[in-house]
Amino acid sequence: MVGVSIFNIKKKNLGEVSDIVLGGTPNKTKHEYWENGTIPWMSSGEVNKKKIYSTDNFITQAGYDNSSATMVPANSTVIALAGQGKTRGLVARIKISLSTNQSLATLIPKDIIINDYMYYYLESQYNKLREVSSGDGSRGGLNKEILKRYPIVIPPIPIQEQVVSILDKFDRLVNDINEGLPKEIELRQKQYEYYRERLLNFPK
């Protein structure tokens, strides 16, 4: 990003700037783990929503207690570790406290980073994240250790806030025309990606 001094930029790993939490799935053959559940439970297929205000499924307290599902706080970022097609490597911002399945990892930001900045940075890293995934092709997968070691560039908090403010505006513009003509949507998406890359291109 133009105007940011190299001396103000920190290069960290995701494990240094966030707590990484994995999820789990209660036994689906036990109805008491699912029927009339009240605990939001997110699957990797929902990461396409980008912002998570609700989940498609809920689990009961018994299901939660008898699985490796873990509650994570709002204003965190989830990333798909695995999933069909293009799902692996996608990220979403969670706006409520929820639990997830084992195909998602939640990154809970520490004081050094704003969650929305972390989200946009990882969104820009989609192809690279898929490249470093274990395995090959569509059968590959991310894991906690890969994420902990994954590099991220951290500018000062005021710069993070500026980046988020600008990209939020572009994000709204893209979403506002989602019902428009395909060519217009494609053009706006390319503009968004171009400016996102420019904003997140800090001095090396």
How would you describe each model-predicted region?
Residues 1-24, 184, 190, 195:
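Non-catalytic DNA-recognition/assembly elements of restriction-modification systems
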Residues 9-14, 39, 72-79, 147, ...:
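Short, structured motif recognition centered on aromatic/hydrophobic residues
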